[in-house]
Amino acid sequence: MSTPHNEANKGDIAKTVIMPGDPLRAKYIVENFFDDYKLVNQVRGMYAYTGTYKGHKLSVMAHGMGMPSVGIYSYELYKFYDVENIIRIGSCGGYKPELKLFDIILSENVFSESNYALTLNNEDCHVTSSNFELNAIVEDTAKEYNIDLTKGNTVCTDCFDVYMTDVNQFLGRVPDGFNPVSAEMEAFALFYNAKLLNKKASCLMSVVDSKFITDVATAEERETGLNNMIKLALDSAIKF
């Protein structure tokens, strides 16, 4: 069964899906890491692929930018395609001075001022969490491959935080003690959908900019320079 946003048939999607934001990153992943693959969705250019990685069936599907976009695609995967696990892999802004470009962050809890939960489910919810079980597998896999991993909380915004008139005013509205290490624009909707539909979600992010460093990742680096994060997600996913 297809949806208005996904032409894949139900059996075309694996139980575990890796979700980058960028469709070109989805293409890059299957072309460079999968044993074999097929394109199962290209509606609106939001590519989805299913294939095998180290002999295990996995899917990779892009989710676009922002909570409404990832909210639609992840909801449909969980609800209509019987997906059980989603790992979002994306970019983020670093909020701690010790973080460097391309450091990998595992998001534990997410705060958002969005009304996503209220609109979708009539719940006034602004903090939600990733799945502990999936996160534990990711942590163990990172140790196995000697990949440095920073765990912490994330703020999820409705606009690119770099463009905020005053980011400190926004941070002043973050709950006391939340202490975010990163900022991005999608994880809240993904985690909330997983909670609502009794599924599992995790989120890995690579730092591509920070107010503490002058360097920023180029568009090309954002597409292809995240290989450690990609490998970590894939090698974790085959253990779910």
Task: Locate the predicted segments by residue.
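Metabolite-binding pocket within alpha/beta catalytic cores that recognizes anionic/polar moieties
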Residues: 1-137
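Glycine-rich beta-alpha junction loops
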Residues: 23, 93, 155-161, 189, ...
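Flexible, glycine/charged-enriched surface loops at secondary-structure junctions
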Residues: 36-42, 146-153, 240
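Expand to "…catalyze enediolate/carbanion chemistry for C-C bond making/breaking, isomerization
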Residues: 79, 166, 217
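Active-site rim beta-loop-alpha module in soluble metabolic enzymes
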Residues: 127-177
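Generic non-transmembrane alpha-helical segments
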Residues: 137-145, 193, 232-240
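Zn-dependent metallopeptidase/amidohydrolase metal-coordination segment
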Residues: 188-222
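His/Asp/Glu-rich mid-to-C-terminal helical/loop segments that flank catalytic regions of hydrolases
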Residues: 211-240
